[in-house]
């Protein structure tokens, strides 16, 4: 930890990477955001911010309306008309403002998994292939664990262990049920959920289906059957600002949206509970516990094989979510990112940077190290926290080659590799020793999460006590995050109130100036002798602030409110153009996930057949039932999309020709986007131009609505203020990742075709 603190204080000169950095160097960032996301990785948050100009009432945020209770609160009235209150100084001074559903909208329901994330089934398949590969090479699958004499338990001890097992199991079931009910209530009320909450909700649903498999037969059909009723009773689940020509079209779009998100969430749940190992005895979890104990307590050095094997479990998201603030600051300084701000803000920067490094690593591996110039090698090494100046070209290539081997070949997470650099470890240490030292600095909270993860990957059971501890630990982290967000919100509200009060004082100043002019003159006259009596030294001690006031990047900054306006603008443009491209794309991705899941199961059976264990690992009954349900929902959604397209064709015949853009046209001009945003809320013209220019990457005056939606989702996920240059960099990163994903899909397709030809 001391090394991390020293590293965090080190000052580094600015540098330029080969690819555009995610957070611009030298640009100030507020860092005052709350990590407010919905159930999914990203979410279009359709929220309009309205300034109420009554007395000193400031901007009210509808997202807090339905969640806060107590004396000082915002309130909803009914569906057709909404009323909210802004607390001023006492309940007697509350000011009310009425708004209809056309003014206020809510966040979109979203339950899908983050992009570019391997499922548990895919990780299990990789682990199985790794084992078989080592067996074929003739080496041991894993390092032998130190043998411990098995002590035969007495009958009384067996009874006590069984009682403890069921006690922790029922307690876990009760806590999971409470948490699931609370989160489901938040979803129905239209509230967004953080990444941590979404991950917790997914794991809890998987645990509930494991503990009580009968729930699959009851909950899923019942939930699907009641979707129309839920949309009627809880309109805040989806935005109510559809500009449709038909009530039927609006109903179908809402039904499609909810079915799509539910199907994606069920598919994620399937992959969590897919496989069960009948012969599992908990050996892997015991090995991990022994490994972590060696590192943290005994000081005994594990084997290199164990270090590399278990280091893969500490994924970037898991590691960043559990790092302390000094460690987050040290990583930001190492990567020369903004190191001032909340923990969530620092995590967002690091997440974007790690994604950028991962994409660059794949590009460098494809192009080869020899294709890089010396300047590019220096920039690449420096971007990864390695020495870049005063080093020969061969040394630069060697450093980068070792990084690529650890990251891409051995699949060591980028966060661990960067943490090892932040510790200023000697270059003479081997990569395994560097990883060992890095794992020693990780908080204890990571161990429980990693232990649950290793059991899921190896398809083994985790004892109920460990699951319960991990669940309670995650709940405590969620509670702390919510407290941070609430404190930040109160600080922002207090700042706004002070600004409003200052404006009121400025307006009332001229009235008091005349009456106080004579008093001021008299006071100044009386004070002149006292000032004259002050010595020269006393006058010299009076401090005067002569520094100029810096405006920073205020003109270039996009606030959270403007991100919401941009989100609304994208939605309205899509409604005007009658686009279903986003829904079609997500449905296509869901079909691909289902197909990949089926192919992974077949590959797992094939790998198990090599060792004669194909009957040991089986698909659970719950996952089979859910798979059938998801396939059925996919068929229903295909019918809804066809019905919507037919409805739009009929409606277009009754509308004047040329008034509606052609269906499927996904490009809009910059002027269209600016016009819609100007209509939603007044924003300075120059700022509108800069926002639109940041979204127009190729500078042709056209913007792809789907690309804009993806950028907005990613930014809105963290609820931050961000500069226009950073928006452009995020768009570039997303497009780079999409190109890499297309290359990987094409490569996999070719490999499958070659394998099929070889079999024939």
From Swiss-Prot:
Pfam families the UniProt entry points to: LETM1_RBD
Alphabetical UniProt keywords: Antiport, Calcium, Calcium transport, Coiled coil, Ion transport, Membrane, Metal-binding, Mitochondrion, Mitochondrion inner membrane, Potassium, Potassium transport, Transit peptide, Transmembrane, Transmembrane helix, Transport
InterPro entries: EF-hand-dom_pair (IPR011992), EF_Hand_1_Ca_BS (IPR018247), EF_hand_dom (IPR002048), LETM1-like_RBD (IPR033122), LETM1/MDM38-like (IPR044202)
Annotated catalysed reactions: Ca(2+)(in) + 2 H(+)(out) = Ca(2+)(out) + 2 H(+)(in); K(+)(in) + H(+)(out) = K(+)(out) + H(+)(in)
Gene Ontology MF term list: calcium ion binding; calcium:proton antiporter activity; ribosome binding
Keyword Mitochondrion (UniProt): yes
Protein name: Mitochondrial proton/calcium exchanger protein
Transit peptide start-stop: 1-117
Source organism per UniProt: Xenopus tropicalis (Western clawed frog)
Entry superkingdom: Eukaryota
Topology class, membrane: Single-pass membrane protein
Subcellular compartments: Mitochondrion inner membrane
Sequence ranges assigned to domain Letm1 RBD in this UniProt record: 254-555
Topological domain spans for side Mitochondrial matrix: 232-760
Keyword Transmembrane (UniProt): yes
Function comment: Plays an important role in maintenance of mitochondrial morphology and in mediating either calcium or potassium/proton antiport. Mediates proton-dependent calcium efflux from mitochondrion. Also functions as an electroneutral mitochondrial proton/potassium exchanger. Required for the maintenance of the tubular shape and cristae organization.
Primary site of residence: mitochondrion
Entry's transmembrane regions: 211-231
Residue intervals of the EF-hand domain: 683-718
Topology Mitochondrial intermembrane: residue spans: 118-210
GO cellular component: mitochondrial inner membrane
Record: residues binding Ca(2+): 696, 698, 700, 702, 707
């Amino acid at each position: 930890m001391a090394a991390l603190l020293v590293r965090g204080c080190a000052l580094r000169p600015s540098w330029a990477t080969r690819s555009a950095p995610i957070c611009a160097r030298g640009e100030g960032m507020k860092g005052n955001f709350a990590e407010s996301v919905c159930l999914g990785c990203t979410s279009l948050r359709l929220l309009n911010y309205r300034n109420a100009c009554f007395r000193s009432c400031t901007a009210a945020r509808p997202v807090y309306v339905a969640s806060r209770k107590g004396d000082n609160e915002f309130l909803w009235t009914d569906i057709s008309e909404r009323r909210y209150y802004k607390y001023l100084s006492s309940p007697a001074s509350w000011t009310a403002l009425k708004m209809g559903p056309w003014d206020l909208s809510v966040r979109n329901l979203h339950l899908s998994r983050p992009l570019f994330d391997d499922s548990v089934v895919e990780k299990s398949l990789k682990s199985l292939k790794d084992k078989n590969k080592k067996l074929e090479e003739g080496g041991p699958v894993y390092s032998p664990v130190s043998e411990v004499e098995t002590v035969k338990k007495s009958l009384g001890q067996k009874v006590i262990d069984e009682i403890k097992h069921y006690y922790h199991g029922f307690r876990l079931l009760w806590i999971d049920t409470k948490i699931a009910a609370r989160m489901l209530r938040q979803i129905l009320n239209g509230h967004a959920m953080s990444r941590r909450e979404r991950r917790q909700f997914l794991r809890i649903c998987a645990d509930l289906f494991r503990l009580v498999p009968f729930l699959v037969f009851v909950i899923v059909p019942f939930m699907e059957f009641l979707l129309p009723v839920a949309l009627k009773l809880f309109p805040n689940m989806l935005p109510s600002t559809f500009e449709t020509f038909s009530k039927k079209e609006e109903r179908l779009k809402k039904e499609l949206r909810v079915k799509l998100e539910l199907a994606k969430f069920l598919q994620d749940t399937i992959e969590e509970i897919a496989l069960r190992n009948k012969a599992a005895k908990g050996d892997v979890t015991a090995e991990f516990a022994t490994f972590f104990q060696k590192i943290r307590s005994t000081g005994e050095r594990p084997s290199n094989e164990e270090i590399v094997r278990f280091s893969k479990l500490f994924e970037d998201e898991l590691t960043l979510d559990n790092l302390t603030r000094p460690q987050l600051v040290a990583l930001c300084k190492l990567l020369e990112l903004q190191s001032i701000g909340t923990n969530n803000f620092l995590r967002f920067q690091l997440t974007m940077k790690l994604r950028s490094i991962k994409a660059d690593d794949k590009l460098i591996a494809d192009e080869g190290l020899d294709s890089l110039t010396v300047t590019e090698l220096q920039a690449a090494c420096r971007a990864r926290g390695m020495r870049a100046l005063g080093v020969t070209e061969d040394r630069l290539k060697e450093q980068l080659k070792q990084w690529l081997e650890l990251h891409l070949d051995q699949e060591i997470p980028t966060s661990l590799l960067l943490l090892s650099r932040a510790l200023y470890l000697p270059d003479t240490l081997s990569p395994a020793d560097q990883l060992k030292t890095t794992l020693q600095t990780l908080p204890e909270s990571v161990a429980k999460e990693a232990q649950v993860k290793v059991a899921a990957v190896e398809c083994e059971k985790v004892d109920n006590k460990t699951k319960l501890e991990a669940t309670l630990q995650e709940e405590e982290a969620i509670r702390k995050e919510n407290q941070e967000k609430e404190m930040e919100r109160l600080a922002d509200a207090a700042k706004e109130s002070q600004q409003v009060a200052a404006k009121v004082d400025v307006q009332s100043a001229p009235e008091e100036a005349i009456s106080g002019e004579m008093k001021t003159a008299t006071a100044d006259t009386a004070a002149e002798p006292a000032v004259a009596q002050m010595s020269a030294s006393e006058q010299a001690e009076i401090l005067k602030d002569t520094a100029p006031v810096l405006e920073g990047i205020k003109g270039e900054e996009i606030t959270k409110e403007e991100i919401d306006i941009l989100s609304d603008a994208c939605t309205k443009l899509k409604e005007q153009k009658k686009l279903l491209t986003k829904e079609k794309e997500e449905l296509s991705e869901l079909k691909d996930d289902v197909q990949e899941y089926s192919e992974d199961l077949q590959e797992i059976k094939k790998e198990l057949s090599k060792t004669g264990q194909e009957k040991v690992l089986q698909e659970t009954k719950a996952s089979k039932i859910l798979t059938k349900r998801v396939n059925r929902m996919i068929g229903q959604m295909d019918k809804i999309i066809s019905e919507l397209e037919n409805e739009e064709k009929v409606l277009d015949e009754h509308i004047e020709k040329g008034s509606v853009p052609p269906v499927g046209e996904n490009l809009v001009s910059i002027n269209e986007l600016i016009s819609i945003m100007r209509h939603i809320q007044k924003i300075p013209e120059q700022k509108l131009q800069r926002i639109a220019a940041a979204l127009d990457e190729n500078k042709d005056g056209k913007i792809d609505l789907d690309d804009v939606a993806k950028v907005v989702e990613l930014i809105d996920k963290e609820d931050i203020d961000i500069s226009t240059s950073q928006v452009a960099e995020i768009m570039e990163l997303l497009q780079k990742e999409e190109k890499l994903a297309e290359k990987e899909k094409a490569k996999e397709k070719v490999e499958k075709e070659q394998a099929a030809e070889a079999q024939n």
